[in-house]
Design a protein with these regions (language model features):
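Terminal-region recognition feature
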Residues: 1-215
Length: 215
């Protein structure tokens, strides 16, 4: 899912890198700067093209994300450029709604027609957050050394008449199939590999290095 430098892991560099502890990395500094800019209204031009996906993936947060992504993707290219500058999305979440995840994902795919999207995983990228991280432009997806990634099967709770429950199960399966299809498209995993992982019926936790290996 990731490419980067220093302690921000890349698929190509991870095979040769040594496990060394370093101070704060450049990507972590940039994430802190983007957060401060968002909170204070300050920051430079690059900060203005950064979006934070921090917290639960829910309807309120997805609206903020979608508005931000559309706004940045609709800007005009600089003189002499065919495409507008990259936008950067920092992701740190325990997950949330599959529907809102898909809404963000679809908007990111549309936006990539106009600009590349850099995604950076910081802290934790779990459940619904994994597809958002993976949806960045290939070659521009990053993850910090100590970030943890978790994937699992789609889950839901429902009560009611048996026919309603059967209908709900069909919908959950449809969401699961869509989730797998999207992850296959964005990573190096095959559909068979993903189904095998998700069929374990447990949360699958990955280190930054393992996430890189999965693509």
């Amino acid at each position: 899912v990731v490419v980067g430098s220093d302690e921000v892991y890349s698929k190509e560099e991870s095979e040769d890198s040594e496990d060394q502890e370093k101070p704060v990395t450049e990507e972590e500094r940039q994430a802190a700067a983007a957060l401060m800019a968002a909170l204070t209204g300050g920051g430079g031009e690059d900060d203005l093209r950064s979006i934070l996906m921090y917290g639960d993936v829910n309807e309120e947060r997805s609206v903020e994300m979608i508005v931000g992504i559309i706004s940045l993707s609709e800007q005009k290219p600089k003189e002499g450029q065919e495409r507008i500058d990259d936008m950067k999305i920092y992701v740190s979440t325990y997950g949330g709604s599959a529907d809102d995840m898909m809404a963000i994902y679809d908007i990111m795919r549309l936006a990539k027609d106009k600009c590349d999207i850099q995604t950076v995983g910081i802290g934790k990228v779990m459940s619904a957050g994994t597809l958002i991280l993976a949806a960045g432009t290939k070659g521009k997806r990053k993850i910090t050394k100590n970030c943890r990634v978790m994937i699992h099967a789609v889950s839901a709770g429902s009560v009611g008449p048996i026919h309603n429950l059967q209908n709900e199960m069909e919908e959950i399966q449809a969401i699961q199939d869509a989730y797998i299809r999207c992850l296959v498209q964005e990573t190096d995993l095959t559909k068979r590999q993903l189904r095998k992982l998700l069929d374990q019926k447990v949360n699958i936790y990955l280190t930054a290095e393992e996430a890189v290996e999965y693509g």
